[in-house]
């Protein structure tokens, strides 16, 4: 990790919404805060066996979640990740379970939720983290098949997961909380200019959740999309990046930020998009909070200038 990634905050970039601009966890998003407690809850995290998803699972266990369910495509990796999470859990009663599920397969998602129903498992928090990073090609050179494959994972699978989550048969499990791990490529198209299918499909997913939030109260299902920032995951290393490529975020920053997003403190962000580097105390108060309350389009997918 670079030096910057090990600091709680660094000088804020000119384009950020808040100062400070965090690169590592800080007290306001600590899972040990009673206000962020996930005690007794079951949390489902797609793509939770490594990287950001694993950090999110760790943070929810630190927040006293009763059960973490992580999904992954590889049985061994998913099983081992769940075992490691359980062994390291700060909460003695907390446990993690690994379930093989390829979200690119609609039948696999149906089977996952049917399994929950059969065993009487109700999910309280859904974290949408699984993603398909499209090839580095212009849209018209990628081919319709490859672009649609990205839509299948990044949009169709997300909608299917949300529908099954929302329509669970277990009664009385409200409010539900949904955290969407998004990307700042949804509003800065130059960031992933070499992978336009990625930005396209992640934008579509964020917009879909934004529209769902229009018709769903946060008291029923709270929805927040977050940008996890730059984290040096194994996938990033596989793409050729190393510790010197960026001032990387600590993976614990998006991990703990996801817990905050699933708490009542984040209810005012229902249907909106936020960066995990932004300071939550600053967002909760002052001019930023005032604009959120007055502007229904602020921090949402849309057209600038209108």
What residues fall within each predicted segment?
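Catalytic loop of short-chain dehydrogenase/reductase
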Residues: 132, 144, 170-218, 229-231
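Conserved glycine-rich Rossmann-like NAD(P)H-binding loop of the short-chain dehydrogenase/reductase
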Residues: 65-81
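Rossmann-fold cofactor-recognition segment
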Residues: 88-107
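Conserved NAD(P)H cofactor-binding loop of Rossmann-fold oxidoreductase domains
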Residues: 129-136
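C-terminal helical subdomain
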Residues: 6-9, 13, 20, 225, ...
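Substrate-binding pocket helix/loop in short-chain dehydrogenase/reductase
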Residues: 137-139, 146-148
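Conserved glycine-rich cofactor-binding loop
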Residues: 49-50, 74
């Amino acid at each position: 990790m670079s030096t910057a990634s090990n600091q709680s905050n660094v000088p804020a970039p000119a384009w950020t919404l808040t100062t400070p601009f965090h690169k590592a966890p800080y007290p306001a998003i600590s899972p040990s805060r009673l206000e962020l407690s996930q005690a007794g809850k079951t949390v489902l995290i797609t793509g939770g066996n490594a990287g950001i998803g694993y950090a999110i699972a760790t943070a929810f266990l630190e927040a006293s979640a009763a059960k973490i369910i992580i999904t992954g495509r590889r049985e061994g990796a998913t099983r081992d990740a769940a075992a490691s999470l359980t062994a390291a859990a700060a909460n003695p009663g907390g446990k993690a379970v690994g379930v093989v599920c390829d979200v690119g397969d609609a039948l696999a998602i149906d089977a996952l939720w049917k399994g929950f129903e059969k065993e009487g498992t109700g999910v309280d928090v859904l974290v949408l983290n699984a993603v398909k990073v499209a090839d580095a090609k212009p849209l018209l050179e990628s081919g319709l098949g490859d672009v649609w494959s990205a839509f299948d994972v990044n949009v169709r699978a997300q909608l299917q997961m949300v529908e099954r989550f929302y329509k669970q048969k277990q009664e009385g499990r409200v409010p539900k909380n949904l955290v969407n791990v998004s990307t700042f490529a949804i509003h800065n198209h130059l960031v992933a200019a070499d992978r336009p299918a990625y930005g396209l499909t992640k934008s579509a997913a964020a917009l879909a959740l934004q529209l769902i939030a229009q018709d769903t109260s946060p008291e029923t299902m709270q929805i927040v999309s977050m940008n996890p920032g730059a984290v040096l995951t194994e996938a990033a290393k596989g793409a050729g990046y190393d510790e010197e490529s960026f001032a990387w975020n600590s993976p614990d920053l998006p991990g703990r930020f996801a817990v905050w997003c699933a708490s009542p403190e984040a209810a005012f962000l229902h249907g909106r998009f936020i960066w995990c580097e932004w300071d939550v105390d600053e967002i909760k108060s002052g001019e930023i909070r005032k604009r959120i309350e007055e502007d229904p389009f602020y921090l949402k997918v849309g057209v600038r200038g209108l």
